[in-house]
From Swiss-Prot:
<dbReference type="GO" id="GO:0046933">
    <property type="term" value="F:proton-transporting ATP synthase activity, rotational mechanism"/>
</dbReference>
<keyword id="KW-0547">Nucleotide-binding</keyword>
<dbReference type="InterPro" id="IPR033732">
    <property type="entry name" value="ATP_synth_F1_a_nt-bd_dom"/>
</dbReference>
<dbReference type="Pfam" id="PF00006">
    <property type="entry name" value="ATP-synt_ab"/>
</dbReference>
<dbReference type="GO" id="GO:0005524">
    <property type="term" value="F:ATP binding"/>
</dbReference>
<keyword id="KW-0066">ATP synthesis</keyword>
<comment type="subunit">
    <text>F-type ATPases have 2 components, CF(1) - the catalytic core - and CF(0) - the membrane proton channel. CF(1) has five subunits: alpha(3), beta(3), gamma(1), delta(1), epsilon(1). CF(0) has three main subunits: a(1), b(2) and c(9-12). The alpha and beta chains form an alternating ring which encloses part of the gamma chain. CF(1) is attached to CF(0) by a central stalk formed by the gamma and epsilon chains, while a peripheral stalk is formed by the delta and b chains.</text>
</comment>
<feature type="binding site">
    <location>
        <begin position="172"/>
        <end position="179"/>
    </location>
    <ligand>
        <name>ATP</name>
    </ligand>
</feature>
<dbReference type="Pfam" id="PF02874">
    <property type="entry name" value="ATP-synt_ab_N"/>
</dbReference>
<dbReference type="InterPro" id="IPR023366">
    <property type="entry name" value="ATP_synth_asu-like_sf"/>
</dbReference>
<keyword id="KW-0139">CF(1)</keyword>
<keyword id="KW-0406">Ion transport</keyword>
<keyword id="KW-0375">Hydrogen ion transport</keyword>
<protein>
    <recommendedName>
        <fullName>ATP synthase subunit alpha</fullName>
        <ecNumber>7.1.2.2</ecNumber>
    </recommendedName>
</protein>
<dbReference type="InterPro" id="IPR020003">
    <property type="entry name" value="ATPase_a/bsu_AS"/>
</dbReference>
<keyword id="KW-0813">Transport</keyword>
<comment type="function">
    <text>Produces ATP from ADP in the presence of a proton gradient across the membrane. The alpha chain is a regulatory subunit.</text>
</comment>
Length: 547
């Protein structure tokens, strides 16, 4: 057997070759140290080059956001479980600002504010990211809000219309139906989504901030039942999450929506609700020892909401003509809309829908107070048909409310006032809707027009909603041409109006009220002419009795 021998020259040559080809990989890394931590906030020393809003890496893969940049230390908000963060642990810079993955893969999913799925349906494949803090579109990049976004709620679409690119505040006390109004708006986009027309389709994002987990699950179940989850993304920061997640959740939803908007698509974002985001930001600011202001909120709480809501826009045609519509929700206490956060958001948005607890308790649902609800876009965001029939609706309801209050103290009213009260009561009944049951705009136009023409005046109040439902089903066949005209974007002309009235009167003849009576108006007697006054004749018909 041959003996294996290696000469020292060969060993020396191999070592020389290795050292000649070796190039050490040196990397420079800034490392800081946690000086103290509590309640989701960590103070870190030793990161002199850290940027504002930069992501920091804590042990265990937990990340934080640098908010306070002081001379000797950084105040960071920990995103995630902060129970294991301890004093003395190392913290590293990432060099990245806070961003979230975006794309169509997020439709139908439930995610946390960092874009991670929490619905148990697997990972979300995404190739693009978008920073959470991005500048809103400039004035020259926008165009006026003129395209309607139908909510399916008669009281809103008729009197406080919402346009694509608008910011409409939904405000009211707790348990007055604020979330239900926004969910109805999402459900009403189903027909547009099924049409397959990109110009009609609206992608929806529901951002739940500080809500109970069961509430978020209920919203998801309602959307799934109606087939709306296929075009909806839910960003969830439930009450059990840290203040950092509640603070960031609206920006995550907005970033995902902006991605679609700049692709020329239309987006609806619901922020439920911004009161809890402001409270979370207040907690963060106080823990970071920032000076408190009114109601202990920090001085930049207005900027917190303004930079979020200013991202809503209808982009110019040069940028694709996409839109981002925002429905922020604010919770009031005892109907006080003059508190700090409500007045801030009212001044930022393009109108508000005020839901009143007294109306809700009376059974008026949605409990919209049309007196102080307003849309600054107005008729520009309505179809021609709706704009024509809804012009006097707000005035009639306002006069009804005023007369109703007066009649409580009046013992006797004239016939005209009684008729106005009767019609107003039927208008209020007509504007009621069941939860999660949006109504197509063509049905809304027909109902409001017929109410204005007095068709419902002879219908008992308890039968108004049943009469409306059965009438609309009948008119879709007996007045199909009128519906086609309305769907084509046209206003009701004289011929269509006459056809609608004729078909309605025919249906009315066969309608039986719940008490068994008919609702057909009796024929009105013609007034006497001037030459007939004081010359009236009475004709007496005698009955012959057979014996």
């Amino acid at each position: 057997m041959a003996e294996l021998t290696i000469s020292s020259d060969e060993i020396r040559s191999a070592i020389d070759n290795y050292t000649a080809s070796y190039s050490p990989e040196a990397s420079r890394e800034e490392v800081g140290t946690v000086t103290d931590t509590s309640d989701g906030i960590a103070h870190v020393s030793g990161l002199p080059s850290a940027m504002s809003n930069e992501l920091l890496e804590f042990p265990g893969g937990i990340v934080g956001v640098a908010l306070n940049l002081d001379a000797t230390e950084i105040g960071a908000v920990i995103l995630g479980d902060y129970q294991n963060i301890q004093e003395g642990q190392e913290v590293k810079r990432t060099g990245d600002v806070l961003s979230v993955p975006v794309g169509d893969a997020f439709l139908g999913r439930v995610i946390d504010p960092l874009g991670a799925p929490i619905d148990g349906l697997g990972e979300i494949e995404s190739t693009e990211n978008r920073a959470l803090e991005l500048q809103a579109a400039s004035v020259l990049e926008r165009q006026p809000v003129e395209e309607p976004l139908q909510t399916g709620i008669k009281a809103i679409d008729a009197m406080t219309p919402i346009g694509r690119g608008q910011r409409q505040l939904i405000i009211g006390d707790r348990k007055t139906g604020k979330t239900a109004v926004c969910i109805d708006a999402i459900l009403n986009q189903k027909a547009n989504w099924d049409s397959g027309d990109v110009n009609k389709q609206v992608r929806c994002i529901y951002v739940a901030i500080g809500q109970k987990g069961s509430t978020i699950a209920g919203v998801k179940a309602a959307l799934e039942e109606k087939g709306a989850m296929e075009y909806t993304t839910i960003v969830a920061a439930p009450a059990s999450d840290s203040a950092g997640f509640k603070w960031l959740a609206p920006y995550t939803g907005s970033a995902i929506g902006q991605h679609w908007m700049y692709q020329g698509k239309h987006v609806l974002v619901v922020f439920d609700d911004l009161t809890k985001q402001a409270e979370a930001y207040r907690a963060i600011s106080l823990l970071l020892r920032r000076p408190p202001g009114r109601e202990a909120y920090p001085g930049d709480v207005f900027y917190l909401h303004s930079r979020l809501l200013e991202r809503s826009a209808k982009l110019s045609d040069a940028l694709g003509g996409g839109s981002l519509t925002a429905l922020p929700i604010i919770e009031t206490k005892a109907n006080d809309v003059s508190a700090y956060i409500p007045t801030n958001v009212i001044s930022i948005t393009d109108g508000q829908v005020f839901l009143e607890s007294d109306l809700f308790n009376k059974g008026v649902r949605p409990a919209i107070n049309v007196g102080i609800s307003v849309s600054r876009v107005g008729g520009a965001a309505q179809t021609k048909g709706m704009k024509k029939v809804s012009g006097s609706l707000r005035l009639e309801l306002a006069q009804f409310r005023e007369l109703e209050a007066f009649s409580a103290f009046a013992s006797d009213l004239d016939a005209a006032s009684k008729a106005q009260l009767e019609r107003g009561a039927r208008l209020v009944e007509l504007l009621k809707q069941d939860q999660y049951s949006p109504i197509p705009v063509e049905d809304q136009i027909v109902s409001i027009y017929l109410a204005g023409e007095g068709i419902f005046d002879s219908v008992p109040i308890g039968d108004v909603r049943r009469f409306e439902k059965e009438l609309l089903e009948d008119l879709k066949h007996s007045a199909a041409g009128v519906y086609s005209s309305i769907n084509g974007g046209k206003a009701l002309d004289a011929d269509n109006a006459a056809a609608l009235i004729a078909a309605t009167n025919k249906f009315k003849e066969g309608f039986i009220a719940s008490d068994g009576s008919r609702v057909v108006n009796e024929a009105e007697a013609d007034a006497l002419g001037a030459d007939e006054v004081e010359n009236e004749q009475i004709n007496v018909k005698r009955k012959t009795v057979s014996k």
